[in-house]
UniProtKB/Swiss-Prot annotation:
SUPFAM superfamilies recorded: L9 N-domain-like, Ribosomal protein L9 C-domain
PROSITE patterns in UniProt: RIBOSOMAL_L9
UniProt name for this protein: Large ribosomal subunit protein bL9
GO BP: translation
HAMAP family: Ribosomal_bL9
A GO cellular component entry from the record: ribonucleoprotein complex
InterPro entries: Ribosomal_bL9 (IPR000244), Ribosomal_bL9/RNase_H1_N (IPR009027), Ribosomal_bL9_bac/chp (IPR020594), Ribosomal_bL9_C (IPR020069), Ribosomal_bL9_C_sf (IPR036791), Ribosomal_bL9_N (IPR020070), Ribosomal_bL9_N_sf (IPR036935)
């Protein structure tokens, strides 16, 4: 019997794949557990339509991510932190601080997707990497300034 997997099954394949299994295995285990459905003409057409929609959705998200990356690359963020006379920070600038600075500019990126090469502990200009989409990465330029110099 041919079935369409609804969930990843270790011995058979990934969700969305059409696989041939024995009738008893399909009827007594896969289908009742919600792991698969029978592969009929209607379900195969529905699967194909769903795949096409998924591909379109991913392309739209990728296009939006590229536009966002281009916008981010052209800006230099200002991050304010408490600093001493010598320019040394009281603490460090983290990916969360950069995410907050981006949010102030109207751009939302999860702080976990922003990586710093080394801890930022002094005033100055730096770069961070951010993964905007699965295959779209961007360099974020930012400048660390002392709090109170915002004027």
């Amino acid at each position: 019997m041919k079935v369409i997997l609804r969930k990843d099954v270790a011995a058979l394949g990934d969700a969305g794949e059409v696989v041939a299994v024995k009738n008893g295995y399909a009827n007594n285990y896969l289908i009742p557990q919600g792991m698969a459905i029978r592969a009929t003409e209607g379900t195969l057409k529905a699967l194909e339509t769903e795949r096409k929609q998924q591909v379109k959705k991913v392309e739209m998200l990728r296009k939006t991510a590229r536009e966002l990356a281009a916008k981010i690359e052209q800006m230099t963020l200002k991050v304010f932190a408490k600093a001493g006379e010598s320019g040394k920070l009281f603490g460090t600038v983290t990916s969360g601080d950069i995410a907050d600075a981006l949010k102030a500019q109207g751009i939302e990126i999860d702080r976990r997707k922003i990586t710093l090469e080394a801890p930022v502990k002094t005033l100055g200009k730096y770069e961070a990497d951010a993964k905007v989409f699965s295959d779209v990465a961007v360099k974020i330029s930012f400048e660390v300034e002392a709090e109170g110099s915002e004027a």
